[in-house]
């Protein structure tokens, strides 16, 4: 019974990865639109996009870490 609860909790914790995937898509979609509108700002926009990617990926990694903690530690 406890093992089933761990597996269900792990599955629910991994839903945070959905938000990270959507966030990364939004960041790079905005980068493409921004470069298409003003190509001279490509370097600046790319650095902002990498920063946004890192923050989005960090939230996804936190969700994955919580899932592993629920599965193997709790």
From Swiss-Prot:
A GO cellular component entry from the record: proton-transporting ATP synthase complex
Tagged with keyword tRNA processing: no
Keywords, comma-separated and alphabetical: CF(0), Hydrogen ion transport, Ion transport, Lipid-binding, Membrane, Mitochondrion, Transmembrane, Transmembrane helix, Transport
Residues the record marks as site: Reversibly protonated during proton transport: 57
Pfam families: ATP-synt_C (PF00137)
GO MF annotations, alphabetized: lipid binding; proton transmembrane transporter activity
Membrane topology, as annotated: Multi-pass membrane protein
Record's subcellular location: Mitochondrion membrane
Transmembrane segments: 16-36, 50-70
Matches recorded under PROSITE patterns: ATPASE_C
Domain of life: Eukaryota
Chief location bin: mitochondrion
Residue stretches in coiled coil: none
Gene Ontology biological process terms in this record: proton motive force-driven ATP synthesis
The keyword Magnesium is assigned to this record: no
Protein's job: Mitochondrial membrane ATP synthase (F(1)F(0) ATP synthase or Complex V) produces ATP from ADP in the presence of a proton gradient across the membrane which is generated by electron transport complexes of the respiratory chain. F-type ATPases consist of two structural domains, F(1) - containing the extramembraneous catalytic core and F(0) - containing the membrane proton channel, linked together by a central stalk and a peripheral stalk. During catalysis, ATP synthesis in the catalytic domain of F(1) is coupled via a rotary mechanism of the central stalk subunits to proton translocation.
HAMAP family reported in the protein's UniProt record: ATP_synth_c_bact (MF_01396)
Family: Belongs to the ATPase C chain family.
Subunit relationships: F-type ATPases have 2 components, CF(1) - the catalytic core - and CF(0) - the membrane proton channel. CF(1) has five subunits: alpha(3), beta(3), gamma(1), delta(1), epsilon(1). CF(0) has three main subunits: a, b and c.
The protein, known as: ATP synthase subunit 9, mitochondrial
Lineage: Eukaryota, Fungi, Dikarya, Ascomycota, Pezizomycotina
């Amino acid at each position: 019974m406890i093992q089933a609860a761990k597996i269900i909790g792990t599955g629910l914790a991994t839903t945070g990865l959905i938000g990270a995937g959507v966030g990364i898509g939004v960041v790079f979609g905005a980068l493409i639109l921004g470069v298409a509108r003003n190509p001279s700002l490509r370097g600046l926009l790319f650095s902002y996009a990498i920063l946004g990617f890192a923050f989005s990926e960090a939230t996804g990694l936190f969700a994955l870490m919580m899932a592993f903690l629920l599965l193997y530690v709790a």
